[in-house]
Amino acid sequence: MVPAGLCAYRDLRRKRARKWGDTVTQPDDPRRVGVIVELIDHTIAIAKLNERGDLVQRLTRARQRITDPQVRVVIAGLLKQGKSQLLNSLLNLPAARVGDDEATVVITVVSYSAQPSARLVLAAGPDGTTAAVDIPVDDISTDVRRAPHAGGREVLRVEVGAPSPLLRGGLAFIDTPGVGGLGQPHLSATLGLLPEADAVLVVSDTSQEFTEPEMWFVRQAHQICPVGAVVATKTDLYPRWREIVNANAAHLQRARVPMPIIAVSSLLRSHAVTLNDKELNEESNFPAIVKFLSEQVLSRATERVRAGVLGEIRSATEQLAVSLGSELSVVNDPNLRDRLASDLERRKREAQQAVQQTALWQQVLGDGFNDLTADVDHDLRTRFRTVTEDAERQIDSCDPTAHWAEIGNDVENAIATAVGDNFVWAYQRSEALADDVARSFADAGLDSVLSAELSPHVMGTDFGRLKALGRMESKPLRRGHKMIIGMRGSYGGVVMIGMLSSVVGLGLFNPLSVGAGLILGRMAYKEDKQNRLLRVRSEAKANVRRFVDDISFVVSKQSRDRLKMIQRLLRDHYREIAEEITRSLTESLQATIAAAQVAETERDNRIRELQRQLGILSQVNDNLAGLEPTLTPRASLGRA
């Protein structure tokens, strides 16, 4: 077990420096990043000269994305699979709590920091704002939910800063609580973290093959976050781990999930760090994880960010070139003033038509989200209705009091699956709608408009706060109670038959009356048992319906809020683009008018200035064309 505390950080840091070297992790090819930053700066300078503050803001945000990338990797899995130990061994630092109990109790975000640090992010207080409270590094080894620094407020997550070279290039690990323990959320709760993740590591030990919940989670996680791997842990404990890995690989192949499986041993990794043993480190197979993070995660995320930034630069240069080119054509041709009146009318008509065409995106977005909201809500209700019907059929086939734990587990798993499937489907439909809106701009001849990216936290949610299915009291009938029910039913039979038999001279209690009493008593007992079973089944069905209604109330609200947030994101994204396009067309017309009124003495200076700015924009575009085909270098994370 990796020790916790600041002293442990210092000791392990010295060991790491002796063994692996303090290799600095940087994004791949910093010189190429410098070229992109230089292109952004040149474009910003031209935008400022032309008083295009909107383009300056967009390019400034793009500059921040390219210079300070953060690649988020979610570590998820069932309870007791070795997730936290994997993270600690990967970083060579005690960044996450490890123990025999439920170690990770809240989400832990580990990112780079020159000095070890830790803080709690607390839930919103009475003023509606969250708070961050610094805590000693030693406290991450305790249950932070009860930390005195929280002041009784709910702890949303723990943010840990670790001086690990692996994190210096922008990697950030999100360690999630294990699933399956007392009070732990379903595996679908982790789905809410995946849309904001660049990769996912699904941790499963080699004691057994994938369980059904694990396979379901792997399939759904791959649909939301295609970049990921399965990490098979504890290979040092199970001699038959290779058979388990091969079986799990076959399961993934049948499920059509192209995720690699990396078998590792955190214990061997810890010993390798302690003993400065490179051969033991290779045997732990941790270099394979580092290679995966370097080649498949960090480099791909960097390429995706760069592609988006290059698109922003290209869009800005095109808009600036429209305005500058229009002005230059007028200034450079004095005879154009004679044709200015008719030409301006034509340009105005073209501008108005272009603006009207770009305005179609609002209709596409509005209609699309109305359909999406209705479809998602209908899909969720259909799934919940199916869960309810299946549960009622299961209840009708047994005694609920004897099988209530099994029924409750099946219902909760079915609800988690339904919520997760609906979540994934809504995410995919939202991405498709974003592409449809971008296509409406392309139909208007504006091919440089990029589709909005939905990968940030707008799709995130919290499925872990859903209440559990209520209990049902299982009280089997005692022998005495059964006798009372039978005697209550048999008494009438004994009296009735006894009185009839008294006509022929028999007593009240005779073989006929006793036999009739036994028959009627047995019938009364069976009828009471049947009524009791019907009553219990009715109560169980009502319990299930009430549970599903509660879940539907919470999840439907979360779904609507999530879709509204996506709609606002798309609306703001495309409204900003539409305003930029409209402004570019308007300023192009204004520049044409102003250029026609330029005095002869100022004409030459203005021509040179316009040619200089257009030349810079042309060089920027040439450099963009040269950068695009080479966006495939692999990031380097240093040695494992």
UniProtKB/Swiss-Prot annotation:
Coiled coil region boundaries: 560-628
MF-aspect GO terms: efflux transmembrane transporter activity
Localization annotation: Cell membrane
Keywords: Antibiotic resistance, Cell membrane, Coiled coil, Membrane, Transmembrane, Transmembrane helix
One GO cellular component, as annotated: plasma membrane
InterPro entries per UniProt: Dynamin_N (IPR045063), P-loop_NTPase (IPR027417), TRAFAC_Dynamin-like_GTPase (IPR051943)
Transmembrane segments: 497-519
GO BP annotation list: response to antibiotic
Keyword Cell cycle: no
Entry-linked Pfam families: Dynamin_N
Membrane topology of the entry: Single-pass membrane protein
Effect of a null allele: Deletion results in increased susceptibility to isoniazid and accumulation of intracellular ethidium bromide.
Inducing or repressing factors: Specifically induced by a broad range of inhibitors of cell wall biosynthesis, including antibiotics that inhibit the synthesis of peptidoglycan (ampicillin), arabinogalactam (ethambutol), mycolic acids (isoniazid, ethionamide) and fatty acids (5-chloropyrazinamide). Down-regulated by the nucleoid-associated protein Lsr2.
Role, per record: Participates in the development of tolerance to both isoniazid and ethambutol. May function through a MDR-pump like mechanism, although it does not appear to directly transport isoniazid from the cell.
Subunit structure, as described in the record: Forms multimeric structures containing a central pore.
Name of this protein: Isoniazid-induced protein IniA
Phylogenetic lineage: Bacteria, Bacillati, Actinomycetota, Actinomycetes, Mycobacteriales
Gene, per the UniProt record: iniA
